[in-house]
C-alpha cells in the first residue's frame, strides 16, 4: 500500500523519530504501526521496551539521510536512484542494524582520497572475505601501510596479483583489466586486430585495423607508430602460431620452405601449402605443417622441423590426419592429431602418446618448466614433462588459457546472455595442481584476444616486502 501522501502531510503520525549521526540530526514524523509491521528492529522495540509508549524517540545511526531513505521506502517513497559507494555501504550497515535483509555490495570503486573512510566503514561492518577483498581492490598505491594491522596486510597481500591483462574484444577495442580490482578500462579509441607483449622492453606490439603497427610502452603509456618492420627476434621466448602482424622474414621463410618441401615431395600443386608455422622459444628451430590435397586420397599432412643454424629441413611425421597445436618443449615437440585424437610427443627421433581419445583439443601450452597444459572442449589436463604422466584433470569450459605462474593460469569463455544475443565473457583463474578456481568474473564484452602482462606498480611485491620487513624487525627486537 502507498502511504506516500500520509507521510508527506504528516497525517495521523504518532511518533517523532529523531535520527542522529556524528554530524547531523533529522526529525521525521512516522507511524508506529508501519515501523512495527515492516522493520524487525522496531517490532522488537515496540513489543518489549518502554519506547512503545513514547511520542518521541532519539536514534543514533550511521547516516541520517540513509536511514531516513530506508524508512521512507516503506511509505512507497523512492529516494536515491544513483547511490555512490559510500551510500551503498552505509545503506548495508543501516539495513543490517534494522535487521532487514541486505547484501554487501560487490565491485565498488573508491577514490584514493576516500580510502580512510572505507577503512572506517569496513571496521563497522567487520572483517570477512568480502570486506578484505574490498580493501584489496581499492588500496591506493601510495598508501601509508604502517597505519594498517600486519594481519590485515597479510590478508590483503594474499588477494593481490602481480599481473594484469590486456584484452581485444570482437569489435577490435582494447582494454586493460585488473583481476584484483576487477576494473575494466578502455585504453584507446583506436581499433586493433592483434597484439603481443615483449617483456624485454615492456612493450605491446599492436596491429591496428588500418594495417599499421604500433608499439605501446606499458611503463610510460606512450603509444607510437612502429615505422620499421617487426622482426622475428622481437618474438624471442614466444610460442608464435598464426598472427595478423606482418613479419617480412616470416613470409619470406614460408615461401622458401614451401619450395623446398615441394621439391622434397617431388610435387608442385595449387592444392598444397603451409598451414601453420611454430617457432621454438629461442628461435633456433621452426615447426612447419604442410598440407597436400589429392582428389583420390584427400588431405595429407606433414610435420617438418627446420633448424635455423644448419639450414636443414627434417620430416618427422606424415599422416592422412590434420596436425595442429605444435609446441616446442626442451627435448622435442608436442602436437595434436585430429582424427586419431591423440597428443603426441616427438623426442630423440621417437614418438610417444601423451594423451589419447581427446576430442577437440583447443590449445597446448606449458610454463617453460615441467607443466604441460592440454585444453579440450570440456577440461584441461596437466601433464608432467619430467615424470611423463598426467598429474591432474579439471572439468571446465574455456576458450583460451595463459600461464600466469607455474601453478596459476587465467582463461576465458564466451557465452550468450539468457535474454539477448549479446555475448559476454567469463574470466577464470585456476590453480592447475589443486584444480581450484582462485578468481572469476564476468565482463560485458566478447573477448577476441587476452594477453597477460606484469603489474609495473608492483603492489603485491611492495606489500610482501613491507610485511617481511616488519616480521624481521619483530624477530630482531
From Swiss-Prot:
Residue intervals of the BTB domain: 13-83
SUPFAM superfamilies, per database record: DPP6 N-terminal domain-like, POZ domain
CDD domains attached to this UniProt entry: BTB_POZ_ZBTB_KLHL-like
PROSITE patterns: BTB (PS50097)
Family: Belongs to the mimivirus BTB/WD family.
Record protein name field: Putative BTB/POZ domain-containing protein R830
Organism: Acanthamoeba polyphaga mimivirus (APMV)
Amino acid at each position: 500500500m502507498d502511504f506516500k501522501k500520509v507521510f508527506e502531510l504528516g497525517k495521523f503520525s504518532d511518533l517523532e523519530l529523531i535520527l542522529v549521526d556524528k554530524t547531523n540530526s533529522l526529525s521525521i514524523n512516522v507511524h508506529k504501526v508501519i515501523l512495527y509491521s515492516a522493520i524487525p528492529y522496531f517490532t522488537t522495540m515496540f513489543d518489549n521496551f518502554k519506547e512503545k509508549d513514547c511520542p518521541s524517540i532519539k536514534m543514533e545511526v550511521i547516516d541520517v539521510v540513509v536511514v531516513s531513505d530506508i524508512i521512507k521506502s516503506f511509505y512507497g517513497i523512492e529516494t536515491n536512484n544513483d547511490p555512490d559507494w559510500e551510500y551503498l555501504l552505509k545503506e548495508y550497515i543501516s539495513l543490517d542494524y534494522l535487521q532487514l535483509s541486505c547484501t554487501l555490495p560487490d565491485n565498488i570503486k573508491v577514490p584514493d582520497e576516500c580510502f580512510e573512510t572505507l577503512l572506517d566503514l569496513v571496521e563497522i561492518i567487520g572483517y570477512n572475505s568480502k570486506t578484505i577483498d574490498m580493501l584489496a581492490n581499492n588500496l591506493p598505491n601510495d598508501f601509508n601501510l604502517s597505519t594498517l594491522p600486519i594481519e590485515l596486510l597479510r590478508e590483503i597481500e594474499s588477494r593481490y596479483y602481480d599481473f594484469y591483462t590486456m584484452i581485444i574484444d570482437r569489435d577490435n577495442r582494447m582494454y586493460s583489466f585488473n583481476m584484483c580490482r576487477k576494473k575494466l578500462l578502455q585504453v584507446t579509441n583506436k581499433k586493433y586486430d592483434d597484439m603481443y607483449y615483449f617483456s624485454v622492453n615492456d612493450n605491446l606490439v599492436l596491429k591496428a585495423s588500418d594495417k599499421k603497427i604500433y608499439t605501446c610502452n606499458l611503463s610510460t603509456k606512450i603509444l607510437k607508430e612502429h615505422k620499421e618492420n617487426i622482426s622475428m627476434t622481437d618474438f624471442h621466448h614466444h610460442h608464435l602460431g598464426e598472427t595478423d602482424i606482418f613479419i617480412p622474414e616470416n613470409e619470406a621463410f614460408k615461401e622458401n620452405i614451401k619450395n623446398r618441401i615441394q621439391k622434397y615431395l617431388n610435387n608442385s600443386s595449387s592444392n598444397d601449402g603451409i598451414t601453420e608455422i611454430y617457432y621454438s622459444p629461442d628461435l633456433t628451430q621452426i615447426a612447419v605443417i604442410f598440407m597436400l590435397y589429392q582428389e583420390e586420397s584427400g588431405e595429407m599432412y606433414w610435420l617438418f622441423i627446420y633448424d635455423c643454424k644448419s639450414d636443414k629441413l627434417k620430416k618427422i611425421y606424415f599422416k592422412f590426419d590434420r596436425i595442429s597445436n605444435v609446441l616446442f618443449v626442451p627435448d622435442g615437440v608436442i602436437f595434436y592429431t585430429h582424427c586419431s585424437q591423440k597428443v603426441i610427443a616427438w623426442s630423440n627421433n621417437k614418438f610417444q602418446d601423451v594423451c589419447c581419445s581427446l576430442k577437440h583439443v583447443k590449445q597446448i601450452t606449458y610454463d617453460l618448466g615441467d607443466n604441460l597444459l592440454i585444453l579440450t572442449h570440456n577440461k584441461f589436463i596437466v601433464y608432467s614433462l619430467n615424470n611423463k604422466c598426467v598429474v591432474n584433470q579439471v572439468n571446465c569450459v574455456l576458450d583460451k588459457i595463459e600461464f600466469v605462474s607455474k601453478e596459476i593460469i587465467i582463461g576465458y569463455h564466451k557465452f550468450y546472455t539468457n535474454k539477448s544475443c549479446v555475448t559476454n565473457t567469463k574470466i577464470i583463474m585456476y590453480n592447475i595442481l589443486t584444480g581450484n578456481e582462485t578468481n572469476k568474473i564476468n565482463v560485458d564484452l566478447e573477448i577476441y584476444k587476452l594477453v597477460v602482462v606484469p603489474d609495473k606498480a608492483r603492489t603485491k611485491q611492495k606489500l610482501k616486502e613491507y610485511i617481511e620487513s616488519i616480521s624481521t624487525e619483530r624477530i630482531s627486537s
